[in-house]
Amino acid sequence: MTKSELIERIVTHQGLLSSKDVELAIKTMLEQMSQCLATGDRIEIRGFGSFSLHYRAPRVGRNPKTGQSVSLDGKFVPHFKPGKELRDRVNEDEEEGF
């Protein structure tokens, strides 16, 4: 699902807000979440999951075109851990023949 599909689905299901209002709310939420992670904070949405940063240590990689070794610096990457309610719901849908 893309961001525009999400906006359309929310507008269709709730019917009270315009697509511009929903789009602004989603953009604002995503921007705030990005800023929070950029400062190293953790985001927890109960019942859904948590977002945090995981550190990837420096390593030696390989250029797929040339096969040449390349030194890759260490970096932080965003990580999502689903909450129990989300995991249960996904598994419930799977059992029903998703």
Curated annotation (Swiss-Prot):
Q: What's the short name of a Pfam family annotated to this entry? A: Bac_DNA_binding
Would the keyword Transcription regulation be found if you checked this record's keyword annotation?
A: yes
Q: Which PROSITE patterns match?
A: HISTONE_LIKE (PS00045)
Relate the protein's function as given in its record: This protein is one of the two subunits of integration host factor, a specific DNA-binding protein that functions in genetic recombination as well as in transcriptional and translational control.
One Gene Ontology CC term in the entry: chromosome
Which NCBIfam families does its entry note?
hip (TIGR00988), PRK00199.1 (NF001222)
Q: Which cysteines are joined by disulfide bonds?
A: none
InterPro entries recorded for this chain?
Hist_DNA-bd, Histone-like_DNA-bd_CS, IHF-like_DNA-bd_dom_sf, IHF_beta
Q: How does it assemble?
A: Heterodimer of an alpha and a beta chain.
Q: Which biological process, per GO, is one annotated for this protein?
A: DNA recombination
Q: Does the keyword Methyltransferase apply?
A: no
Give the protein name, as stated in the record.
Answer: Integration host factor subunit beta
Give the highest taxon in the source lineage: Bacteria
Which UniProt keyword terms apply here? DNA recombination, DNA-binding, Transcription, Transcription regulation, Translation regulation
Query: What are the protein's GO molecular function terms?
Result: DNA binding; structural constituent of chromatin
> What organism is the protein native to?
Pseudomonas syringae pv. tomato (strain ATCC BAA-871 / DC3000)
Name the protein family. Answer: Belongs to the bacterial histone-like protein family.
